[in-house]
Structure formats: C-alpha cells, structure tokens
Swiss-Prot record:
Extracellular compartment spans: 1-55, 108-129, 188-217, 361-378
Gene name per UniProt: CCKBR
GO molecular function: gastrin receptor activity; neuropeptide receptor activity
Residue spans, topological domain Cytoplasmic: 78-85, 149-168, 241-338, 400-452
Record's keyword annotation contains Electron transport: no
Cysteine disulfide partners in this protein: C125-C203
Entry keywords, A to Z: Cell membrane, Disulfide bond, G-protein coupled receptor, Glycoprotein, Lipoprotein, Membrane, Palmitate, Receptor, Transducer, Transmembrane, Transmembrane helix
Glycan-carrying positions: N7, N28, N34
Name of the protein: Gastrin/cholecystokinin type B receptor
Any one annotated GO CC term: plasma membrane
Region (Disordered): 255-285
Gly residues compositional bias, start-end: 263-272
Function summary: Receptor for gastrin and cholecystokinin. The CCK-B receptors occur throughout the central nervous system where they modulate anxiety, analgesia, arousal, and neuroleptic activity. This receptor mediates its action by association with G proteins that activate a phosphatidylinositol-calcium second messenger system.
Amino acid sequence: MELVKLNRSVQGSGPVASLCRPGGPLLNNSGTGNLSCEPPRIRGAGTRELELAIRVTLYAVIFLMSVGGNILIIVVLGLSRRLRTVTNAFLLSLAVSDLLLAVACMPFTLLPNLMGTFIFGTVICKAVSYLMGVSVSVSTLSLVAIALERYSAICRPLQARVWQTRSHAARVILATWLLSGLLMVPYPVYTAVQPVGPRVLQCVHRWPSARVRQTWSVLLLLLLFFVPGVVMAVAYGLISRELYLGLRFDSDSDSESQSRVRGQGGLPGGAAPGPVHQNGRCRPEAGLAGEDGDGCYVQLPRSRPALELSALTAPISGPGPGPRPAQAKLLAKKRVVRMLLVIVVLFFMCWLPVYSANTWRAFDGPGAHRALSGAPISFIHLLSYASACVNPLVYCFMHRRFRQACLDTCARCCPRPPRARPRPLPDEDPPTPSIASLSRLSYTTISTLGPG
C-alpha cells in the first residue's frame, strides 16, 4: 500500500514556489515529482493550529490503541491454551501484521508531515513503504484464509479434519507472509527520497512510466481487494446458509424425536437420541458444545470395563430454559462467524478509500489532487491506519472467551497476595464428609475395582 501524504505547500523562495505543490500529493506522491500549480487555500493561523492539534491527537489515539490492543491479543492468544485453535492462529498473524503497520509506518508518516521534510533517509523510506505493503497484504490474505478455514470447518467438517491442524495453519501463515513479501518487492525498488524544494525532501514512488503506475494500481486493486472480497463473500454466504439449515434441521429433529417419545411412552433407561447424520451434517455431542468449535465430529462409543451405575451416571433431564447442546454449538458458531464478518467489513471499510484513491490517482492525477487535497486525504489517511486498532475492540466486545482470557492473563501477570487461611481451633471437630462425597467415593471404588 502506498503511504498517504497530507496536504502541504512546498517551501521555497519566490512567489511561484509558494503556489506550487508536488503533482498529486496522494499516497506518498506516486508520481514522478513534477510540480503543478494551483491557487493557494487561504486559512487562518487558528484553523491550521486546530487542524494540527486534531490530527496529532487522532494519530496518538490510533497509535496507542493499535500497539496496546494488538500486543494484548498476541499475549492472550499465546498464553491461553483454550484459545489455541486454527482460527485464532490466523487471528494471531493478523494481530502481528496490524502491530507492524502501527509501529513501522505511523511514526514515519506523521513526523515528516509535521516537520515539512523527510529526515530519515533512503533506507527508512524504502523500508516503511515495503513494510506497509506487506502488512496490508498479510492482513488481507489472513482474512481470506480465515474465511476458507471456517467454510471447511462448518460446511465440510469430516473432510476438513484431515488437514485442519495447527501445523497446517502455521504453514499457511508462513506462505501468506512469504507471498506478501514477494508481492511488495516493487515498492523498495521504485521508492526514493527526492528533493522538492530548498531543504525539503519527500519519500516518493518513482515509477518508470504512467502505464506502469496504472498497471500496479489495478493489480493491487484486484489481488488485495476485489478477488479477496468475492472469495470471502461467497465463503461466508455458504457458511450462513449452512448454519441456517443446521438450525432448522436440528429443530425438525427435536420435534420428530419428541413426538416419537410421546408416542412410545419414553425411551427405555432414560437414553437420549444420538447424533443424526443427514446430507453430510451431524449433530454434535454434548461434550463438544463450545464457543469456538471447529465442526461436528463422529464420536465412537468407548467400552468401559468398570461397573456402570446407571443411577449415578444418567443425566437428569428437565425442562430447562437453555438451548440443547447441539443447538448451543450452532449458536456458538454463529457468534464466531458474526465476529469474523464484522472484522472483514471493518477492514474493507478502512481500506476501500485508499484503494480507490490510488486507482484514481494513477489514471487522473490532477483531478484526484483537486478533489482530495486537505481534509479528505487526512481522513483517508487516518481511516487506513484505524484498521490496525479495530480488531482488538471487536474481540473485546464480541468474543466472550477472549474477554475471559484477558482477565485470566491480567490475573496471572498481577497476582493477588494469598489470603491467610484461618487455623482450626483445637476443640473444633474435623470436617465430616457429606453424603455426596461418600457416594462419589463409593462409585470411584466400585469403578476402579470393576466387576468381581
């Protein structure tokens, strides 16, 4: 992605230099450095100071939220064993790319615009341009990988279990970083620091020709925006359809089972109907219900040599208000998919203006410059960087298990001093085991010894 350069006049001597700006001050000036003149926009000192204060404040807020939020995601996903799933592995890669975008790009974009010149040299110029492109590419490819992984887990669960492992996810993540690194090689090649006035330097993209610039802009628009958008739209559309059919299928199965039980006067032994398979779908077992389930699994019954006490192990059925395990698992999948959809929509909302401005700039530089100079390009700039801080907010508001893991991590990092337990008095009787404890002890003893 090209860096957004905020609107400012070129500092120079003479009346003409004060009216000239670099041709197309969009996205780090991807033109060839020619100057185009236009009437200056007269603004008071108070307006400039207010705009500068707002810009710096928004930059600081976005930077702190991006760095702090993504570091929190990396720490929580790295320390919590319950969150080490395939989907969260891709979310971890997404957090690393967002952190890279914030740390490696935001300071080197804001400071030159505040100082009026790029003081960091050619190496930093090439590195910032390259790392920003890699970060955006990794984020896009990670979202595509998450969509395909969710589609396989929900719509093709039995086939997906062969390859849906954390080791396979690690290989896919490595491939996304390598592919992004190769795709963004033209940025450091065609990026340079050039003078645009007395003691004024800019980090710009110097493409060999206008045709090359146009081809590159269209290529990025297709590879990193249009094609991923279509793939994710199709994948999440099929996922939504499958979840809807699963909920309806589960509801119909429950109605049929209840009518059969009423007609037969109940199932013997309090047994519950097992998982039903139809058209490749299966109803999960009770033990598989969870918030981040990857799909439904075929559970084989395990034989137990120990004596089974049906009176102690039979589940107590009651008309509870909560959903059944199969229905709860489908609802949990809906929550996860809804969270991922919000992440995708926010990502494309943040980067659509940048892609559009890049393409417009490549085909109509003067027109884009006249329309987007000033406040519009500043808004586009901040919106693109805001994509690095929205994911932590989405996780905190829409992922219950992530919130709990955050609390557990904070409790682990800041442990409370242990409370001193009161010592029993000398005349105090020892605790007497309850009836439930005795029942569990007897059952454990019988199960361990087995039938005589």
